[in-house]
């Protein structure tokens, strides 16, 4: 007979009740700080709506009017060195954290005026939302993308759930760097249904990450009620299976939020581990703008009226007065302080003519400034002499696969900020393909196996990179990068630019192309053209062990995200590397002419190099001289057009050889760029050799048909050599 034994969840969820004595225990100083923040946030966001109505704000304005108790309570409970990450509805979180950071020690709003530094924070926040040059990000981030790393504002994020992995990575970095700072990641009820949240919550529990996942449950994801989106209504229950304890609080009461946050931080500093706080709160207006939700029919006026009675802007001061913790005069002082601060911010950002506000021309950013900060503009290679094979005299043998492991290990020896993470990297005697061999023995504390959670570990690596580490991430097959697309491209690839160049993501992603192994259409992607769509990424493709070491060293030194493309068929290929050093750098953006010729320029990379060299050798007997160039750098910004151009001017003909299907290849855009730059030197259009436009099949015969062969490349070279494309 079967027996069913109840299994208890590995964590617990509590609901918090707050009593009058809790208010008194908090003390008048912190209560006044919370109330001051409430008034400032409300005045700030009311001003935003006025400016939007006056057409002085471009883009959406998502206010948190009604939800201010959350931001005020959390910010008051945190230390200056703690950090917060937020959402598209971030004005309150951002402003509260910035003001508490820039306030002098012991600041008491019932006694002290807002300081110039605090006023500057308000001014810069308003300027950013208005798209002005004096904003935190130079105006390019706006309402949904606010960033100020100094004050612990990790950045607000317009992708629902998109900031959670990054915040988790920052918190993980605090632990690895032996700091006791806590990170709070704010997100709404809608984000609880995003897979990225569940991936990183599980990893945060596995790794003991000091982060508070703060769910602002305002019951509506735009107009979708939480009971339409989640079977479980108390969202804090959903992380119990990950072993994460949680508490549910009244999100309209700043004291409840403060106490829950303070207690979680205290436990976390003593024993780093994630925690979930769910605040039941309410936004009085629709998703964006000034209209109420009832105007759109997804909730009733009666419901809105019930929640309006709980509005913290009126309920909280009333409660404090009833307990003798606030006088009417003190209340009026805090209200006046908020109004005065916003009046000054408006005067900073606008002027008035004929009774109408306008933005003076000098407040706008220079249009051409938008071209800056896509990538790091610092000279990180100052004093470095780049090397090529010809610069060395003594060598030793090494395979491509050995070079990957050796270069990684050497960089970990040189820089304690370098960590390695990915699936199986600490297993199987050096990872699934030997690329991390020796690292577990040398640096077990900096080598991290991950779950099969590409979104999670990619985003966590991005957050850790922004916090000062230099992660090396292995994505086992390039196709799996599609699972992590939001983190790799919307986040890591864009945020430097969106935040005005104030953040860096110095991480390396390694991935192994498996074309030719019979893995089929979901494990055989060459992702070069995909990564090249996002200009924040640098792309390197070393075709031999010597180049791998030099380019890996270069990649780790960058303050930008770099993807290194490898090919499985190269792993066993032997090469010669310097006998007495691994500390050399190959210049990013520098292609390598491997064979000189005069009739056709052949551009290729990775396994295409050997095939093109063989085809060129065979063609030589037929009187056609091909110049073969290993591109090495594949992103369009870093492409070595100087070397390409010098060759084109000599040959008058170009052939691009890739293993990708035509629609997933670099060749289309690269050919267009070459024809635009060197049109006068070309005798014919640019030729292309790629796989046909199909997912690569498993069948050996079918896959071999798809992959460009030496014979097919030779045939195309011959046409190009005769300038007949």
Residue ranges, per PLM feature:
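Glycine/charged-rich beta-loop-alpha catalytic/anionic-binding loops adjacent to active sites
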Residues: 52-57, 108-109, 142-157, 181-186, ...
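A glycine-rich helix N-cap at a beta->alpha junction
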Residues: 126-128, 205-215, 449, 493-511
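Glycine-rich ThDP/TPP pyrophosphate-binding loop and its adjacent helix/strand module
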Residues: 152-343, 532-652, 656-657
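Cofactor-binding active-site loop characterized by glycine-rich and histidine/acidic residues
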Residues: 46-49, 54-207, 225-231, 236, ...
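Active-site nucleophile and cofactor-binding loops and adjacent substrate-binding regions
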Residues: 59-67, 88-89, 146-164, 188, ...
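Glycine-rich loop at the start of a catalytic domain that most often binds anionic cofactors/ligands
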Residues: 64, 72-80, 96-106, 431-442, ...
């Amino acid at each position: 007979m079967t027996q069913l034994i109840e299994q208890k969840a590995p964590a617990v969820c509590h609901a918090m009740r707050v009593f009058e004595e809790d208010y008194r225990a908090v003390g008048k100083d912190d209560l006044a700080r919370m109330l001051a923040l409430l008034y400032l946030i409300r005045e700030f966001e009311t001003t935003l709506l006025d400016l939007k109505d006056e057409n002085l704000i471009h883009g959406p304005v998502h206010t948190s009017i009604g939800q201010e108790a959350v931001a005020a309570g959390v910010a008051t409970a945190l230390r200056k060195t703690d950090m917060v990450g937020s959402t598209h509805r971030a004005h309150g979180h951002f402003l509260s954290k910035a003001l508490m950071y820039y306030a002098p020690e012991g600041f008491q709003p019932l006694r002290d005026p807002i300081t110039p530094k605090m006023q500057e924070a308000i001014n810069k926040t308003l300027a950013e939302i208005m798209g002005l040059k004096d904003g935190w990000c130079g105006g390019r981030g706006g309402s949904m993308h606010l960033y100020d790393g100094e004050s612990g504002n990790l950045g607000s994020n317009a992708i629902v759930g998109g900031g959670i992995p990054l915040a988790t990575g920052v918190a993980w970095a605090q632990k690895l760097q032996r700091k006791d700072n806590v990170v709070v990641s704010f997100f709404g009820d809608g984000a609880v249904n995003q897979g990225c949240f569940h991936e990183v919550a599980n990893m945060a529990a596995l790794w003991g990450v000091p982060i508070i996942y703060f769910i602002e449950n305002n019951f509506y994801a735009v107009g979708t009620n939480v009971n339409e989106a989640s079977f479980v209504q108390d969202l804090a229950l959903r992380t119990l299976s990950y072993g994460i304890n949680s508490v549910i609080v009244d999100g309209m009461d700043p004291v409840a939020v403060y106490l829950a946050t303070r207690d979680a931080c205290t436990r976390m500093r003593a024993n780093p581990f994630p925690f979930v706080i769910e605040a039941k709160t309410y936004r009085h207006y629709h998703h964006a703008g000034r209209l109420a939700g009832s105007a759109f029919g997804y909730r009733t006026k009666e419901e809105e009226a019930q929640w309006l009675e709980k509005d913290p802007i009126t309920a909280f001061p009333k409660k404090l007065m009833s307990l003798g913790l606030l006088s009417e005069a003190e209340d009026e002082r805090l209200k006046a302080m908020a109004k005065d601060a916003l009046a000054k911010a408006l005067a900073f950002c606008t002027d008035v003519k004929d009774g109408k506000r306008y933005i003076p021309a000098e407040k706008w950013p220079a249009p051409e400034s938008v071209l800056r900060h896509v990538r790091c503009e610092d000279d990180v290679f100052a004093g470095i002499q780049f090397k090529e094979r010809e610069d060395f005299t003594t060598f030793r043998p090494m395979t491509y696969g050995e070079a990957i492991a050796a270069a990684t290990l050497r960089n970990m020896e040189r820089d304690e900020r370098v960590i390695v993470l990915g699936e199986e990297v600490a297993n199987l005697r050096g990872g699934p393909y030997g690329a991390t061999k020796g690292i577990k023995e040398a640096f077990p504390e900096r080598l991290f196996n991950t779950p099969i959670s590409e979104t999670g570990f990619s985003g966590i690596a991005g957050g850790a990179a922004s916090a000062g580490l230099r992660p090396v991430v292995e994505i086992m097959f390039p196709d799996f990068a599609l699972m992590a697309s939001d983190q790799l491209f919307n986040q890591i690839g864009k945020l430097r630019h969106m935040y005005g160049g104030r953040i860096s993501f110095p991480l390396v992603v390694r991935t192994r192309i498996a074309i030719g192994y019979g893995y089929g259409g979901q494990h055989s992607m060459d992702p070069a053209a995909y990564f090249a769509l996002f200009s924040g990424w640098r792309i390197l493709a070393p075709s031999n062990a010597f180049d791998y070491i030099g380019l890996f060293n270069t990649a780790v030194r960058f303050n930008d995200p770099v993807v290194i493309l490898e090919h499985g068929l190269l792993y066993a290929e032997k090469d010669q590397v310097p006998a007495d050093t691994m500390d050399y750098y190959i210049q990013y953006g520098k292609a390598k002419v491997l064979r000189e010729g005069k009739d056709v320029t052949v551009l290729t990379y990775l396994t295409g190099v050997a095939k093109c060299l063989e085809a060129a050798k065979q063609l030589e007997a037929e009187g056609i001289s091909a110049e073969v160039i290993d591109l090495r750098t594949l992103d369009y910004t870093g492409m070595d057009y100087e070397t390409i151009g010098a060759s084109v001017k000599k040959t008058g003909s170009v052939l691009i050889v890739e293993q990708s299907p035509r629609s997933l290849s670099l060749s289309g855009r690269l050919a267009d760029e070459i024809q635009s730059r060197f049109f006068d030197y070309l005798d014919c259009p640019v030729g292309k050799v790629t796989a046909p436009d199909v997912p690569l099949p498993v069948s050996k015969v079918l896959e071999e048909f798809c992959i460009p062969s030496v014979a097919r490349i030779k045939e195309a070279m011959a046409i190009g050599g005769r300038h007949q494309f």
